[in-house]
């Protein structure tokens, strides 16, 4: 089965009840989760589109972006929702797509250095409204937390490395104001990430190591594996 065939037959799932989500998150985050559940209302957008595509950011040329291109080929009329988009930094084929970005995209520095926005990207993602009945989601840590109107299908490249493997992800930039702020906000960011992950019942991993990582981080078992395409052709 090709990725296109998988996407066109994908088992889209609706969001779980917030109380059920709260029951699934780690015990260490439950107190913070109850506060968020009480004081942070979730207002879903109204569905005005049949299908959409969501991805963290389109600023480079990598495997995750190839997957989004495959999604675009499967659903060529579907708009792509993403936090940041740099036409010169990613694959030129995206210029044919309808791409909708967050307000952060107006800051050119962040388009070229998305890691500098790490502490605020999850919150910006929460305000990314995707008004579609169905959404195919490609994520490494942000797009699964967009505000979806309808059902979604999650193709996970990895749980958020910037959160669970931050030193490895940041590399030489593991010191400074951004990593310090990231560590300070870590409990709130972990709650946001688990809340986003557990609102979707079905995940697909792109490799066996990612399947194991999803199980370790989110407690999701029996996640199916579907390998990503190796080229944009």
Mark where each language-model region is:
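Membrane-proximal helix-turn-helix segments that form the acceptor-binding/catalytic region
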Residues: 171-203, 211
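Active-site donor-binding segments of glycosyltransferases and PAPS-dependent sulfotransferases
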Residues: 74-142
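Helix N-cap/beta->alpha junction signal
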Residues: 139-140, 158, 207-208
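Short amphipathic alpha-helix
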Residues: 64-74
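Glycosyltransferases and closely related glycan-assembly transferases
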Residues: 43-45, 73, 125-134, 141-157, ...
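Helix-loop-beta element that forms the nucleotide-linked donor phosphate-binding surface
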Residues: 204-206, 210-230
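Active-site proximal beta-strand in glycosyltransferases
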Residues: 134-137, 147-176, 224
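Nucleotide-activated donor-dependent transferases that construct or modify glycoconjugates
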Residues: 45-59, 83-84
